[in-house]
From Swiss-Prot:
Keywords: DNA damage, DNA recombination, DNA repair. One of its GO terms (cellular component) is bacterial nucleoid. Belongs to the RecO family. This is DNA repair protein RecO. The gene is recO. GO terms for biological process: DNA recombination; double-strand break repair.
Length: 250
């Protein structure tokens, strides 16, 4: 049994003196794990950094075995993100959420396709990568069967003025209909409605992370009796701190 495909490295844990157990994500194969011989060595360790795009080859004698992984580096996203704490936080969050949420050996191409481009753009910096990461989490929720319905208001059916989401149903709510339940609803940032130019700021990023994080926590990680990954919570905390800094200097 074997396959070869472009993959994103999601994790690599030391195993023995020089080997590691790696998790990779590809378009056609989904999330796969395997043993990497010499994966922590000086020569190969840089390849297996979470976030890197690699051309990976998985082999095993039987389909249900752990198997072995080898790879060649395509794009060193991990190294390029090191110079910017926010970019690094985004990268770590993406990798840990993907590994924790995706089922093993099950293809989810819609969740994979945006990731290589997103990871490549990390080196460019800017808040766009945060928005892209939140959009990707919304795609992941949809792929796993928990998609948000942001097309029209759940109460009135109107398609404009959508500024909130019901935490119970995951459906959008307009400002007019939201008034009686404002303290219970989740803010809906405009960039999730394809209006990126209107609110590219830390407050919108915080609201977006809170929104997708709520449903990831309840519907994906919660059903497995696990919390959101620490790297995902750390990204939210970093963005929340940015909003406080901006408020103090306003």
């Amino acid at each position: 049994m074997e396959w070869t495909a472009p993959c994103i490295v999601l994790s690599a844990q030391p195993y023995g003196e020089a080997d590691c157990l790696a998790a990779v994500f590809s378009e056609d194969q989904g999330l796969y794990r395997g043993l990497v011989r010499g994966g922590t060595s000086r020569q190969r360790g840089g390849i297996w950094q979470p976030g890197n795009l690699v051309m990976a080859r998985w082999t095993a004698r039987l389909a249900d075995q752990l198997g072995s992984l080898t790879a060649e580096l395509i794009h060193p996203a991990a190294a390029l993100a090191m110079d910017d704490p926010l970019n690094l936080a985004v990268l770590r969050s993406l990798c840990t959420v993907a590994e924790g949420a995706l089922p093993d050996r099950e293809a989810h191409p819609a969740a994979f396709i945006p990731l290589p481009g997103l990871l490549t753009r990390l080196s460019l910096g800017g808040g766009q990568v945060v928005e892209d990461a939140i959009r990707w989490e919304a795609i992941l929720l949809r792929e796993l069967g928990y998609g948000l319905d942001l097309q029209r208001c759940a109460v009135t059916g109107q398609v404009s003025g959508l500024h909130y989401v019901s935490p119970r149903t995951g459906r959008a709510v307009s400002s007019d209909a939201a008034e009686p339940w404002l303290d219970r609803l989740l803010p809906l940032p405009a960039f999730l409605l394809h209006q990126a130019e209107t609110d590219s700021d830390p407050v919108a990023w915080r609201d977006g992370l809170r929104l997708t994080g709520y449903f990831l926590s309840r519907d994906v990680f919660g059903t497995r009796h696990r919390p959101l990954p620490p790297a995902r919570m750390s990204l939210y905390d970093r963005i929340a701190a940015l909003t406080e800094t901006e408020r103090e200097h306003a």
